[in-house]
């Protein structure tokens, strides 16, 4: 399947014969879906299972994901979170010839998905995306990690620490 925004990075999802779920950003080299999810903030396997449920394809994808192994490598005392390591993996796939750093990887990822000038799924696309993935029911009773700010107005829509109910999720 594909997510093709009005502006911004295309996301293409595919599975292989081993039931591993892959994603391509802007038709670049493929990476494990779980690496993308870890970069989005779902760092642990349990976080991902809570988001998507238990599925043999998801388990196969988590087993293939190199993020955990890479994050645990010794770097002379520098400890990386799973999110940071996932960001670096995505950065290496998108820009293989450039030197990597957590800061540059974070900036690239934010510009790919969080900059309203560069990424826009539009209202209809957002509706279809949320409906197909049942986002409202999946995030029900979760806690908001960071303030959610309306990119057009700068208004804080939801505060960090707030518990999401179905009414909030549908907004």
Task: State the predicted function of each range.
Residues 1-171:
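N-terminal non-catalytic structural scaffold regions of very large proteins
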